[in-house]
């Protein structure tokens, strides 16, 4: 027993690789586990992600190069603060990129793709009633990644998903209220209906509404234009 306890205590962190650690940190930032401006201490990164000191350091350096975190010499790293202006500008960039994927999505989507999107939309619907912040984030992201990746233009897909990843995704930042979360859930199903109907104009309109979240979005959801 004593020998077993000593072996456990002496177990060294795994060398997972800096890329894997950086990806895990990025997921947690986007899920709201680390808020705007949160400090990321290297020792905490080592413990949380069970990684080596070298991997933790390289992961933070990689995230700093991408702009996800900032470094202050002699103090360390913190999550990049997205101010209101930057947030608005990123929203509009998302609208441009994601609506640009729509024609190809409509052209490429199969019945199996549509069925899979319905499954993911249902998963998000369950998460908004019973899930925590991370579950909501992961379910919502899974739906949007699946939808976006139907686009045949791989570079456009990469750009769209990269910009999506630059936005904070805490419930407070991503959805203004529980009513807005529920509305976003409804919009997922409306987008699937538009995709099934091969209605490019309607799907573009719904994608833009879904990203911008206008106050009068109920009025802005039109009937099919096909």
Can you name each region flagged by the protein language model?
Residues 90, 102, 111-172, 186-193, ...:
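Conserved amphipathic alpha-helical segments that form helical-bundle/coiled-coil interaction surfaces
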Residues 16, 114-115, 179-182:
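Short helix-capping and inter-helix turn/linker motifs at the boundaries of alpha-helical repeat units
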Residues 1-107, 149, 219-226:
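Short linear motifs at protein or domain termini
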Residues 48, 176-226:
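C-terminal regulatory/effector modules of DNA-binding transcriptional regulators
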């Amino acid at each position: 027993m004593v020998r077993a306890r000593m072996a456990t205590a002496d177990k060294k962190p795994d060398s997972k690789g800096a890329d894997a650690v950086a990806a895990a940190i990025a997921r947690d930032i986007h899920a709201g586990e680390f808020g705007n401006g949160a400090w990321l201490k290297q020792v905490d990164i080592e413990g949380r992600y069970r990684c080596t000191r070298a991997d933790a350091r390289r992961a933070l350096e990689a995230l700093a190069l991408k702009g996800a975190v900032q470094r202050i010499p002699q103090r360390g790293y913190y999550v990049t603060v997205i101010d209101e202006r930057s947030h608005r500008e990123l929203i509009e960039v998302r609208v441009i990129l994601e609506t640009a994927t729509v024609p190809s999505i409509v052209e490429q989507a199969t019945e199996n793709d549509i069925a899979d999107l319905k499954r993911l939309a249902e998963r998000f619907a369950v998460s908004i009633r019973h899930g925590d912040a991370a579950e909501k984030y992961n379910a919502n992201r899974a739906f949007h990644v699946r939808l976006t990746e139907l686009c045949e233009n791989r570079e456009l897909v990469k750009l769209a998903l990269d910009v999506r990843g630059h936005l904070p995704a805490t419930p407070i930042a991503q959805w203004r209220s529980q009513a807005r979360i529920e509305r976003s859930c409804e919009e997922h199903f409306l987008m699937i209906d538009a995709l099934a109907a091969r209605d490019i104009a309607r799907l573009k309109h719904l994608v833009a509404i879904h990203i911008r979240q206008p106050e009068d979005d109920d009025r802005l959801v039109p009937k099919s234009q096909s």
